[in-house]
Amino acid sequence: MQSYLQYRRIGQVVRKQFADHPEWGQRVQGESTDPSGNTSENDETVWEKRSESRPLALPPGVQRRDITDSSGTPSSVFLVSWEQDQDPMNPRNYSMTARITATLIVSALAFAVGAASSIESAVIPQNAAAFNVSEVVASLATGLYLLGFAAGSLVSGPLSEILGRNAVYIGSLTLFMIFIMASGLAPNIGAQLAFRFLAGVFGCPPLTCAGGTIADLWNPLEKTLTFPLYAILSFGGPVFGPVIASYMGQGTLSWRWTNWIMLIMSGLVMGLILLLQPETYGPLLLKWKAAHLRQVTGDKRYRSAMDVQKIALVERILGACKRQFSLTVHEPIILLISLYMTVIYIVLFTFFDGYPFIFQDVYGLSQGLTNIVWVAMYVGIAAAGLWVPVVYGWTKREFEAASSSSTTTTSGTGVVPCVTGIDPNVNAEGEHGQQEQEPEGGRDEQNTKNPHPARPENRLWFAMLGAPFIPIGLFWMGWTDYVRHTPNPQLKTTFPPNTNKVTIK
């Protein structure tokens, strides 16, 4: 719903602009010369038919480009990009309230699918008894859900770059809810495990694409504040899953209510997405704008980058899958971070099965109270927020230094920086001469609102600060896991490892 209204608003803006500037819609006959300079009659006829007519003046943010299609035929298009630094249609220029709301909704979505990953661990004894299997087999409900995450992540990213963020969120969440419901109705353990795996496949897009949504809304410096917020809230899902199901299956409330609770929670988040979440993927918004420009002007040459660079869905998905393995092989830093993240998630989800052995077998706590112990773990996750102001200050100074260095270099070479929104190659008639290629990502990368790119290593501050906490916490836990100690030291050991989880993410 919100995406549809957003599409309508873009159309209203385009129509109003053309009503205020009627000269943008005036036309003259196109050139009769081939872009290569040939002037043969045959070439002239072909080029005239191809170019037809063009606007006398192009709207802001539209540039004329000569391109060659897949068949080798040259053609001219009007490439649609952001109008200016403060283009209101650019997601990074939404109001602060709108951007925070969108970030919180994505965080709530990640919380819901994250909670579904761990909530079954709270009712493993009841699940095993109901299906007459061992608790080890029943614990596969959690493991297969995570395998579904891994499988779905290969496809969800490329899909969001074709269909947009909201389409992937809504479509995947709908299927996720269907399979969660099927898991709750499963008549045997085999059916439940199969449906849990499929729920994981369709539950992964919020986690895979959420980083893209955050990047759509916030510039690199702002992400130093907003991404930890998203990480702290989203990591609350796996932690609070067992807390939500603490006493399910032990009284009148069936253990199957773990699925119904997740279904209700997912439905509420779905309502928020439909009613409040705007589309944030910039290339798709520009595609919508180009479609409205074609409709208003009748000129089919208005195109966005997505229209010009047509890549089949299957080809894009295969390319994304290949890229992940290629980067892992050729980029050691990606391989190392991936392995480290794997270890961290192994530690996190090992706790789901390990806590009952510690707090029930050693300290004699009840099943429900053992699940509530997970609240202490979230304190450690939230504590990672204490590092945010410190790292933000370091990051800000890094960006300022990079910007200052860039300005000095530009001044020393005598290069006049191009002001976004003013194309020095455009004449008074809106015609374009030879132009340099825009940087990847369009003019938004040169947006003066966005800080100059700094060193990639700058993003490792959080990771370096949090890395020591994993071994400290695990050593602490092993050292105090004896009946002669009270449960208090064990509760405190949950803080350090979970602080690390957020800082690494």
Locate each region found by the language model.
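Extracytoplasmic
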Residues: A98-E135, F351-P356
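Extracytoplasmic gate region of multi-pass secondary transporters
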Residues: S121, S326-V379, G385
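Intrinsically disordered, low-complexity terminal tails of fungal membrane proteins
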Residues: M1-S95, Y281-A320, W394-E457
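Conserved MFS/SLC helix-loop-helix module at the cytosolic interface between two early adjacent transmembrane helices
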Residues: A151-G190
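Helix-breaking motifs and short loop linkers at transmembrane-helix boundaries and internal kinks
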Residues: A116, F131-N132, V155, L163-G164, ...
